[in-house]
UniProtKB/Swiss-Prot annotation:
It comes from Burkholderia lata (strain ATCC 17760 / DSM 23089 / LMG 22485 / NCIMB 9086 / R18194 / 383). Substrate binds at N168, R179, H186, F200, G201, E202, Y203, R213, Y292. Its cofactor is NADP(+). This is ADP-L-glycero-D-manno-heptose-6-epimerase. NADP(+) binds at residues 11-12, 32-33, 39, 54, 75-79, 92, 143, 169, 177. GO terms for biological process: ADP-L-glycero-beta-D-manno-heptose biosynthetic process; carbohydrate metabolic process. The gene is hldD. Pathway: Nucleotide-sugar biosynthesis; ADP-L-glycero-beta-D-manno-heptose biosynthesis; ADP-L-glycero-beta-D-manno-heptose from D-glycero-beta-D-manno-heptose 7-phosphate: step 4/4. PANTHER family: ADP-L-GLYCERO-D-MANNO-HEPTOSE-6-EPIMERASE, NUCLEOSIDE-DIPHOSPHATE-SUGAR EPIMERASE. Binds 1 NADP(+) per subunit. Contains a large N-terminal NADP-binding domain, and a smaller C-terminal substrate-binding domain. InterPro entries: Epimerase_deHydtase (IPR001509), Heptose_epim (IPR011912), NAD(P)-bd_dom_sf (IPR036291). Belongs to the NAD(P)-dependent epimerase/dehydratase family. HldD subfamily. It catalyses: ADP-D-glycero-beta-D-manno-heptose = ADP-L-glycero-beta-D-manno-heptose. The keyword Transmembrane helix does not apply.
Length: 330
């Protein structure tokens, strides 16, 4: 049967397409908006059956043009948290998602979609409960509002609906994201260009570089998506993070040491990297004060209860793999 991946030329979508290929799945309809043409590179080493622009896709899917569709991996969205055009964001992330959901429900198609930890905003608890959800930007609100629709629909849905609140995802195929690419990606490029990585200094009680996030490898994100794809009886909204909060220092230090290893140099401790000027701390910008999350950490209780028991890569493991991959692309 046919599979559909929206946002297929994007970061997570392309990784899902590649992972499906590795399982022998090639009857895939890739849906995206290639106005930003450089995203095509993410699909060059992938096998797909057809490509459709997102505007054409919604109408044809609703019309039943693709026959029996087993599953839709709905990764297509505007993920720029700095976007201020609310009308664009709501149309692209909310209305579009509702249209795809409605057709999946009507046709009995598995619906696996990208939500976001941005829904939690400035909360200090990261559990899938309404009372801790307080998005700080229109991107987070667009994801929040769609999750509320899902909560209303789930009790009567006859087919799978699985939403994943992605935390800070990093890994291959994110180059096109520019300023919205991961910290690991930017640290890698900064070190190659300047010979050092710059991190924020002390802020809000956190020592320099010790602000923490739940950094999750796209490898793990893909594995979780495929686990639920294999278990259509499991529905719900789930946090998708490692369950560990690790400091930005860990990202930077791993980037530096992996690049040193590739250059046949020995690893250094964080203190040694700072002492040698390989990591530099800059004053925390005034523009971000009061708007910056110093801590995120996924509560994995629901995910584990659903039966997903595989370990998640640590920053040291995942960023090391990613830097080696990036180095091979240069």
């Amino acid at each position: 049967m046919t599979l559909i991946v929206t946002g297929a030329a994007g970061f997570i979508g392309a990784n899902i397409v590649k992972a499906l290929n590795e399982r022998g799945e090639t009857r895939i309809i890739a849906v995206d908006n290639l106005t930003r043409a450089d995203k095509f590179r993410n699909l060059v080493d992938c096998e797909i059956d057809d490509y459709l622009d997102k505007t054409e896709f919604v109408e044809r899917f609703a019309r039943g043009d693709f026959g029996k569709v087993r599953a839709v991996f709905h990764e297509g969205a505007c993920s720029d948290t700095m976007e201020t055009d609310g009308r664009y964001m709501m149309d692209n992330n909310f209305r579009y998602s509702r249209a795809v959901l409605d057709t999946c429900l009507a046709q009995g198609t598995q619906f696996l979609y990208a939500s976001s930890a941005a829904i939690y905003g400035g909360s200090t608890r990261f559990v899938e409960e309404r009372d801790v959800e307080a998005p700080l930007n229109v991107y987070g609100y667009s994801k929040f509002l769609f999750d509320q629709v899902i909560r209303r629909v789930l009790p009567t849905a006859k087919s799978q609906i699985a939403g994943f609140r992605y935390f800070n995802v990093y890994g291959p195929r994110e180059t096109h994201k520019g300023r919205m690419a991961s910290v690991a990606f930017h640290n890698f490029n900064q070190f190659r260009a300047e010979g050092k990585v710059k991190l924020f200094g002390e802020y809000n009680g956190y020592a320099p570089g010790e602000q923490t996030r739940d950094f999750v490898s796209v490898e793990d994100v893909t594995k979780v998506n495929l686990f639920f794809f294999d278990h259509p009886e499991k529905s719900g909204i789930f946090n998708l993070g490692t369950g560990r909060a690790q400091p930005f220092n860990d990202i930077a230090s791993t980037v530096v040491n992996t690049l040193r290893a590739l250059d046949n140099q020995p690893p250094l401790t964080l203190a040694q990297q700072v002492e040698q000027g390989l990591i530099e701390y800059v004053p925390f910008p005034d523009a971000l004060r009061g708007k910056y999350q110093c801590f995120t950490q996924a509560d994995q209780t629901k995910l584990r209860a659903a039966g997903y028991d595989a370990p998640f890569l640590t920053v040291q493991e995942g960023v090391d793999r990613y830097v080696r991959w990036l180095s091979g692309q240069v």
